[in-house]
A protein has these predicted regions:
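Glycine/proline-rich active-site loop of Rossmann-fold NAD(P)-dependent oxidoreductases
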Residues: 101, 115-125, 155-166
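Catalytic helix-loop patch of NAD(P)-dependent Rossmann-fold dehydrogenases
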Residues: 34, 69-108, 133-134
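Mid/C-terminal beta-alpha module of Rossmann-like enzyme folds, strongest
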Residues: 151-217, 227-231, 236-239, 243-247, ...
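NAD(P)H-binding glycine-rich loop region in Rossmannoid oxidoreductase-like domains
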Residues: 1-35
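Flexible, glycine-rich beta-alpha linker
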Residues: 65, 85-86, 106-124
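Glycine-rich "substrate-gating" loop/helix at the edge of Rossmann-like oxidoreductase active sites
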Residues: 84, 111-118, 134-146, 170-174
Length: 262
């Protein structure tokens, strides 16, 4: 708390990005709660103690709205909250604490956000197993990390966003299905598309989002899903050639993580 107080002292704004996300938030809920909820409370208290309180830009998640399979898209910011895992419940609790505080804040509920730099982060085996459990028609809206950074940066000096809760997604051109999104990687690596039969039918909490207000206020939708595809193609242009002789073996290993009969 002392370090946080020192870091926040005399700042004009704070972007609070520290968080433990799935899958670790689900396998180590105690640690995740300490970082996600208690850590956020420390930041809130530090801001509240400042003579001139800085704006807190708080990244939340589309996951707070729960499973999307019975929802008519796009998801609206005022739709009910339904936590389906620890991570979503932590975000809901943090949002609740922000609204109960007297500090200036803006909440940004983020869509699926990865790029060519962080796509391999985390427990790969656990993520692959989970990936194959989900329904191929699950809606997902991608948010490029560049677009997220622009949105957060633009929020810092925009008084119109204070007290608002906004969705961050890269727009209609970045709205796709789970199958299409997952196949971007193997397709780019020259492995071909994964078969529909490898996937299960579990719902998920991603969705297409109504980002009209956030785009109007923050003007952030720039790179999107097309930018992500270009980055992967550039990053793996030589690896694709090296992997070509082993593509069958790699596909077979990936599909071993599926509980379905592909």
């Amino acid at each position: 708390a002392i370090c946080v107080n020192a870091a926040i002292n005399k700042q004009d704004a704070v972007i609070h990005l520290a968080a433990i996300i799935p899958m670790l938030s689900e396998t180590n809920p105690s640690l995740a709660e300490k970082v996600n909820v208690q850590g956020t409370q420390i930041v809130i208290d530090a801001i509240a103690a400042q003579p001139k309180m800085p704006l807190l830009v708080f990244p939340s998640s589309i996951s707070v709205h729960g499973f999307s399979n019975n929802r008519v898209p796009p998801c609206r910011i005022d739709e009910p909250l339904h936590a389906q895992d620890n991570y979503a419940s932590h975000k809901i609790e943090c949002e609740k604490r922000l609204r109960a505080s007297n500090i200036p804040w803006v909440i940004l509920r983020i869509g699926a956000c990865v790029d060519a730099l962080n796509v391999k982060a985390g427990d790969q085996e656990a993520m692959l197993r989970h990936m194959f459990t989900l329904d191929v028609d699950t809606r997902i809206e991608y948010l490029h990390p560049h677009d997220a950074a622009i949105a957060m940066s633009n929020a810092l000096d925009n008084p119109a966003v204070i007290g608002k809760t906004l969705f961050l997604g890269s727009g209609k051109s970045s709205q796709t299905s789970w199958l299409e999104f997952v196949n971007i990687m193997p397709r780019t690596m020259g492995l071909g598309d994964l078969p529909v039969s490898a996937f299960g039918h579990e719902p998920y909490y991603t969705d297409w989002m109504d980002t009209a207000e956030s785009q109007q206020l923050l003007n952030f939708q720039q790179l999107g899903l097309d930018g992500y595809k270009r980055e992967l193609a550039q990053k793996w242009r030589f690896l694709r050639i090296l992997l070509w002789p082993f593509r069958g073996l790699i596909r077979h290993r990936m599909l071993k993580f599926s509980a379905q009969k592909a």
